[in-house]
A protein has these predicted regions:
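Anion-recognition interface
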Residues: 1-273
Length: 273
């Protein structure tokens, strides 16, 4: 949050000083920093360069690793996340009309500052890889050259671990309607708590077993066309192959968004309606 300017300059200096002290004292030869929003920092803030310089002063060489989803899936996840923090009143179709044109989903452009700062040391892992059935974590460890050291420490439970579960269609639509009613302005504390209540309520009743899938075929087609050239450049640079040869799409499934009308209760929950 310091690097992306959500904290003031003094806190930014303090955070970087703490990181520098850790790097100076650690006996480790590998340090991992993980933050999803690293991928969308404004170039003006020079986050890759700041980190590369800081690490270099302590004898570390920056590498960039990223997990890649098709833009349509990433946009659905972004929409569900906004619902999870009760910050979205638009339908998915309306969300796509503005967000679907955002340059933050141009992966080739977003990666370029990190590629330069890391002197080309980039590991790009497809969320689903046509070339491998191995779990994502195993592929990430191998891709970073840490397989021999870490693979013996990773059991089946580690490889299958999931966190930050995405909201499903019931919680997403409930959040959207509550936002439009202004309920988010009446919450004490972070409104993410309200989103978690919606998720927990749905999951406890056997609802939302699947993550949200928006109903906007025309918008998703425009998204695919808009980013096709950038994806081709990205795939050629990272894998030396075409995008479709590496990236496996999500299994085909119909939209489950409920914005078009009231949700029909699931059989298990019908008695509670």
């Amino acid at each position: 949050q310091a690097l992306d300017r959500r904290r003031g300059a003094a806190e930014r200096r303090e955070a970087l000083a703490r990181l520098d002290a850790i790097l100076a004292a650690t006996p480790a030869d590998t340090v991992l920093l993980s933050y999803e929003d690293f991928s969308v920092q404004r170039p003006l803030w020079r986050v890759p360069e700041i980190l590369a310089d800081l690490f270099a002063r302590r004898g570390f060489a920056l590498e960039a690793a990223l997990v890649v989803k098709p833009q349509a899936e990433q946009l659905a996840s972004a929409y569900a996340l906004r619902a999870q923090v009760v910050a979205e009143g638009r339908t998915f179709r309306g969300f796509l009309r503005s967000e679907g044109a955002s340059r933050r989903y141009d992966y080739a452009e977003r990666l370029e500052p990190w590629r330069r700062a890391a002197a080309g040391r980039v590991t790009a892992l497809p969320y689903r890889d046509r070339r491998s059935d191995a779990p994502l974590l195993a592929r990430l460890v191998d891709g970073l050259g840490l397989g021999e050291r870490l693979a013996p420490l990773l059991g089946p439970a580690d490889l299958a671990y999931r966190t930050n579960r995405s909201s499903g269609p019931v919680a997403v639509e409930a959040s959207r309607r509550l936002y439009r009613l202004g309920v988010h302005r009446q919450v004490t504390g972070h409104r993410r708590l309200l989103g978690h209540i919606l998720d927990d309520w749905a999951w406890a009743r056997g609802l939302d077993a699947e993550r949200f899938r928006g109903d906007a075929p025309e918008g998703l087609a425009r998204v695919a066309a808009r980013y096709a050239a950038g994806n081709a450049r990205f795939a050629a640079a990272c894998w030396g192959q075409s995008w479709d040869a590496v990236i496996a799409p999500a299994p085909a499934a119909p939209p489950n968004a409920l914005a078009a009308g009231p949700a029909a209760p699931a059989p298990a929950a019908a008695g509670e309606a």
